[in-house]
Amino acid sequence: MKISIIGISQLTDFVLDNIINYSDEINIYSDSRNFDFENKNLTKKNVSIFTDKNIDDNLNKICKTSDVLFFLSDSDPFNVFSYKKCLMYNPSTKSVFQATDRDIYEMYKDKKYPVISPFNLKEDDYLYLIKE
């Protein structure tokens, strides 16, 4: 199973630690370098970290080559837009996105979207994507 994570935020480490044993290939894409995150995960053999200034332009390829996608940037508009764009490219891709604003999180949660948030995070909110 190929898992892709788009964005490095406070949730990325937590999610990565919980999914690391479920995949032989985890690719993490960020538009800027996070040296603390990179150094912490340098020795993990199944994790690759890519800096890509044009993530939005390469989203089609990422969506089509991933079995599971996590949109975990600190930008709620980017996460929501990318999630919906990915559904257009590949409707069968399993994905979840982060909403850091409580109102946005609750709005999407009420509409039954696959959304997670740092202030109300449960492993069950995203691990079902990998265990299916």
Where does each model-flagged region fall?
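Cytosolic regulatory regions of ion transport systems
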Residues: 1-132
